[in-house]
Structures are given as C-alpha cells and as structure tokens.
C-alpha cells in the first residue's frame, strides 16, 4: 500500500538542484537536531540508571519508582499541545531554545531530590519543561523537508534515541562510580553532568536554526527558491484535499487513532527503557557492566531505525512498515518474558527495542501526509500528547506488577501483547487509507 508521492516540481527537470539542496539542508540541520534530541532523551531516561543507587538511597520500591518515572509523561502531555502552538506562533528557533534551557535546569535539579514527594514533583516539572520538543522538531521537519524525504530524515532524528543508549548507557554506568566524590552520591553526579548540556545548547539553538527555508541565508538563491516553491506546492496539494483547523485536527478520527497506536508504542518503549538497567543488573552485573550491556539493544536499534526509514522512503509506504516494526517489538518483548536464559532475554529485549524505535521513524512521517500548517502543529502535538500517556502508564504498571509478583515478566509480557494487537489494527487502517486516497486520485484523473 504505497503512499502517493506528493508535490512533484521542477526538480524533475533539474535533479542536481534537488539533490544538492536537500544534501545541504540535511547536513546543516540534522546533526545539530540529533545532538539536541540525544541530550533530551538521555535526560528523560537516565532515571533508569540512577535507580540502581537512588532507589535504595531514598527508599523507593518498584511501584514508587515506576510511578515517579512515569510522572514525567503526565507533565509532558498536559503541556504538549499548548507548547507546540506556541512554537507555531513564536517560531521554532526561539521556542526550542526555551524548552532546552528549562528542561536542563529541571534535569540537573533531580540531583537534589530527597524523597518520594520531591521525586514526583521534579519529574513532573521536567516533563512540563520538555513538552513540545519532539513534536516541535517533527513539525519543524515538515517545514524543511518534502514528504518524499521524511522517512529517512525522521529515522536520522530518532536515531538519536539508540545513539543515546550506545553512548549514554556506558557513561551513566561510569558516572555512578563517582559515588562519594565531593560529598555527592553517584546518582546525583549522573543528573548534574547529564543535565548541563541542555542548558549550554539552548543559546546555540537560537543562533543555528531558522524558522523556515525562506530565512536560510546559507542556501544559494536558486536552492532557497526551489525549496520554498517545493514546500509551498506540497502544502497546497495537502490543503487541496482538505484544510484542518486546530480544532478539527485535534478531533480528527485519524489523528485520534494514530494517537492510540502511538500510546502502545510508548508503552513498549518505556516498559523496556526504565527497567532495562534493573533487569540487566539482576543477572549479577556491576553498574559499569550494566551500562555496557545496556548499549547492545541501543546498537541494534540504531541499525534498525536507519534501515527501515530508508526502506520506507524507497517504497513510499508508511503504514505497513510501522505495523511490522510494532509487531516485531511486541513479539520480542513477549518472548523476553517467556525466556529463562539471560543471554536470550537480552537478545529478545534488543530486538524489542529495535522494533519500537524503528517504528517511530516511519510512524511520524504519516501525519504530514494529511495535515499541514497549524493543523499539523496541533495534530502532531495531539498524537504525541495522547500517546505519551503510555510513558506514565507503562512504568507504573510494570513496577506495580513487579512488587506484586517479584518479577518484571508479567508487566512486560502484557505490554508485548498490546503492541501486537496495535500492529494488526494499524496495518488494517493503512490499507483502508490507501484505498481512500487511490479513489480520490482516480476521481481527480477522470475529471
């Protein structure tokens, strides 16, 4: 069920101009955006490594830890749509810089929590501060990259997640070894050191990014003119099918369905990430060994997200690729709950993590095929805000079942089953959407 190609232009007559323009845009924007998301994701999930010392030091059981870890997403979802609308109003450059500065402060403040109340409070504030960053960047990408390029570009952006695991997991393990240095515990050093980069990057964002291609002085005139024209043509074609206001986008059945699917993927992702260090350490590993082993699933995911994004672009198909990724993630997580051998369990968790991360790179190319302008800003934020509730639900659910049963298997197995059902639903939905689009194309041709 290939997605229809949108917005052909004069690039058909001058492929060198298109290739040169998109290469320059990609090289200018994506490495820096990836760096910012690397820092964001590290600050979001480093609580998993901090828990190896923090839980004992502050007296948290698995349910209290899972609840507090998940509160990040409750704060995130309450502020996500307003934050993305502010980005649309004030521009990505200024708003993303504001987001990074405030989340950096909150991430560093995690070093000074003293119990459950302060843990819950600061995690919620961290979520509120970071709200809007991911959907804001996703919206920013729709302003700079034609639809045909978004699968691979989004894969690059979301590759920051496994990169943060490959690099961040060993670093986090080593930071825990600073326990006692200057009177601070290892988990406190982890929060302080990993929170600082966001604060330092904030002013650079304000300088490095531009809000739209028309402001890109680093492009040649003909490149800038081509990109502005291409993006305007695509926007007109999308709006020619139907223009969505912010309210219509927020209540659109397709948006709500995609939000529900994203919810299952967020459950899958965070069910793995917040407890993976504890699972690995439970096999008898040290903190440093845990960090090194935890980098393995991230490395597998890095390969998967880039490969699937490129394949999706070549086929110009999104729904089926995303469905298969969620199916692989859910099936592998279920397998990890059934396996006994530690090596086999880590391998299954690596495959599950690869599925959940590669899903996102393809999935986020879907909303831009039927939303644009303020409708895209609101719709993307709504999908993210509703779906991100899974980030609150999954850690609490897995932690509570761990306290009840003494094992992580029950919670992880249940989340795996949920992801499998969602994969089937997404595939069926994609086939129906493709049929509807092809009907519109046929009717337009007949006219």
What are these regions (language model features)?
Residues 78-117:
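Conserved MFS/SLC helix-loop-helix module at the cytosolic interface between two early adjacent transmembrane helices
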Residues 122-159:
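Cytoplasmic helix-loop-helix junction between adjacent transmembrane helices
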Residues 94-108, 320-335:
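Structural signature of the two symmetry-related core transmembrane helices
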Residues 59, 91, 112-118, 129, ...:
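Helix-breaking motifs and short loop linkers at transmembrane-helix boundaries and internal kinks
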Residues 152-176, 197-198, 384-394:
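Glycine-rich segments within core transmembrane alpha-helices of 12-TM secondary carriers
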Residues 47-48, 247-305, 360, 364, ...:
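Extracytoplasmic gate region of multi-pass secondary transporters
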Residues 370-407:
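A late C-terminal transmembrane helix in Major Facilitator Superfamily
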Residues 79-92, 304-316, 402:
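Helix-to-loop junctions at the C-terminal end of transmembrane segments
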């Amino acid at each position: 069920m290939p997605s229809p190609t949108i917005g052909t232009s004069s690039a058909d007559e001058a492929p060198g101009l298109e290739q040169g323009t998109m290469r320059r845009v990609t090289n200018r924007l994506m490495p820096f955006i990836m760096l910012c998301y690397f820092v964001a994701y590290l600050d979001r999930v480093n609580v998993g490594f901090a828990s190896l010392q923090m839980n004992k030091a502050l007296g948290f059981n698995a349910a209290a830890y899972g609840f507090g870890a998940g509160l990040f997403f409750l704060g995130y979802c309450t502020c996500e749509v307003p934050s993305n609308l502010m980005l649309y109003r004030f521009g990505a450059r200024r708003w993303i810089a504001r987001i990074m500065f405030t989340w950096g402060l909150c991430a560093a403040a995690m070093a000074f929590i003293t119990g459950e109340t302060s843990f819950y409070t600061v995690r919620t504030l961290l979520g509120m501060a970071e709200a809007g960053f991911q959907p804001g960047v996703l919206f920013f990408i729709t302003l700079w990259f034609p639809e045909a390029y978004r699968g691979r570009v989004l894969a690059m952006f979301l590759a920051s997640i496994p990169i943060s695991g490959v690099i961040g997991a060993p670093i986090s393990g080593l930071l825990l070894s600073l326990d006692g240095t200057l009177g601070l515990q290892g988990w406190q050093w982890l929060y302080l050191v990993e929170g600082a980069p966001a604060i330092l990057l904030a002013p650079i964002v304000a300088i490095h990014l531009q809000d739209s291609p028309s402001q890109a002085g680093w492009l040649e005139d003909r490149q800038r003119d081509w990109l502005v024209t291409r993006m305007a043509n695509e926007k007109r074609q999308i709006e020619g099918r139907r223009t969505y206001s912010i309210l219509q986008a927020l209540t659109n059945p397709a948006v709500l369905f995609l939000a529900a699917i994203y919810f299952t993927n967020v459950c899958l992702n965070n069910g793995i990430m917040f407890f993976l260090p504890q699972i690995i350490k439970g096999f008898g590993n040290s903190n440093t060994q845990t960090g090194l082993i935890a980098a393995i699933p991230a490395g597998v995911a890095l390969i998967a997200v880039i490969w699937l994004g490129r394949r999706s672009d070549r086929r110009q198909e999104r729904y089926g690729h995303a469905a298969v990724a969620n199916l692989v993630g859910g099936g592998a997580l279920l397998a990890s709950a059934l396996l006994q051998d530690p090596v086999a369990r880590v391998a299954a968790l690596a495959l599950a993590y690869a599925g959940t991360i590669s899903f996102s790179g393809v999935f986020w190319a879907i909303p831009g095929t039927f939303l644009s302008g303020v409708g895209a800003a609101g719709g993307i934020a709504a999908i993210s805000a509703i779906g991100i509730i899974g980030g609150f639900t999954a850690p609490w659910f897995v932690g509570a079942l761990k306290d009840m049963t003494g094992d992580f298997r029950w919670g992880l197995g249940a989340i795996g089953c949920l992801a499998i059902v969602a994969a089937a639903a997404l595939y069926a939905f994609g086939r129906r959407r493709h049929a509807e689009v092809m009907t519109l194309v046929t009717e337009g041709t007949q006219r």
